[in-house]
């Protein structure tokens, strides 16, 4: 099963990037074919219809294909002002924008339709980003994704990782593994392998 894991942050010491690395490792242990994506590796401007009218940026086209090729995604989202960050919204806005005149990418939801998505978050606060999840999940549903019922929010993230950026708490690791397992299980049933590799 092809699984895409990414964090909604580009900060060097981001808790959610650390969480994404841990999640990717747990998924590989469970037999998934994991792509750990760093959004900072792609040059994606703020969405602007005037920019789009000139031509969809090349890195947006690359991301469309990457997201499409994976049957399942796991998103590790920060929480900014009780919601998800602009990086996540901007990425999904670009990916869901049809490419006029392109027979493949003229469908808004080609990249996302039927994808199974697991949602994780990490935050220095006690709630661990739960409010971010509560805003992100409706967006994913609007993109015709199936969101795994199991989620996990890592609170007090500033002290949750050791010097090697590994989680200190086995219980947290088990909760993340539960999200991974449910996401992979659902994807194996809801997203035919052929559709994820065309």
Cite the ranges covered by each PLM segment:
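N-terminal beta-loop-helix "entrance" segment that forms/cooperates
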Residues: 39-57, 160-164
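A generic structural motif
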Residues: 30-35, 145
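Helix-loop-strand module that forms the ligand-binding subsite of alpha/beta enzymes
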Residues: 56-143
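Glycine-rich phosphate/pyrophosphate-binding loop and the adjoining helix
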Residues: 1-4, 146-198
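A general structural signal for well-ordered alpha-helical segments in protein cores
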Residues: 16, 20, 60, 88, ...
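N-terminal beta1-alpha1 ligand-phosphate binding loop
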Residues: 1-32
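Cofactor-binding loop segments of dinucleotide-utilizing enzymes, especially the Rossmann-like FAD-
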Residues: 8, 39, 122
